[in-house]
Amino acid sequence: MFQLLCAVFIGGGTGSVLRWWLGMKLNPVHHAIPIGTLTANLVGAFVIGAGLAWFNRLTDIDPMWKLLITTGFCGGLTTFSTFSAEVVFLLQQGRVSWALLNVMVNLLGSFAMTAVAFWLFSQAASR
């Protein structure tokens, strides 16, 4: 049990640090859309899709790796709370169109990245 806890802890810490770094580097790039948060959410969606596809096919992998990557890393990297706060901030500034675009791109982009990665890695794992 302690090993599993450590796997989630290490993955979560790594994902959180990467999310912070992406925000620091990429959020200033655009005046209205927080590109760092979007990147973190899209990358996390892709990684979890790929991970789930691999873990579905390769059942002999230690469950610790699934926890480290999906629950830990992706859980630390992706962020619904920051995304929500950024949308509220845009709404408070009267930037309704930007807020709606941000919601649409984050949600649809995350769904698409998860589906594409799952499909790609399912195909690769079946070969």
Swiss-Prot record:
According to the record, the protein's activity is controlled as follows: Na(+) is not transported, but it plays an essential structural role and its presence is essential for fluoride channel function.
Taxonomy, superkingdom: Bacteria
Q: Choose one Gene Ontology CC annotation of this protein and give it.
A: plasma membrane
Q: Which GO terms describe its biological process?
A: cellular detoxification of fluoride
Q: Where are the transmembrane segments?
A: 4-24, 35-55, 71-91, 101-121
Q: One of this protein's Pfam families, by short name?
A: CRCB
Specify where it is mainly localized: membrane
| Reactions performed catalytically | fluoride(in) = fluoride(out)
Q: Where in the cell is it found?
A: Cell inner membrane
Indicate the secretion signal residues: none
What is the role of the protein in this entry? Fluoride-specific ion channel. Important for reducing fluoride concentration in the cell, thus reducing its toxicity.
Q: Which family does it belong to?
A: Belongs to the fluoride channel Fluc/FEX (TC 1.A.43) family.
Protein name per its UniProtKB record: Fluoride-specific ion channel FluC
Where does this protein come from, organism-wise?
A: Klebsiella pneumoniae (strain 342)
Species lineage, top-down? Bacteria, Pseudomonadati, Pseudomonadota, Gammaproteobacteria, Enterobacterales
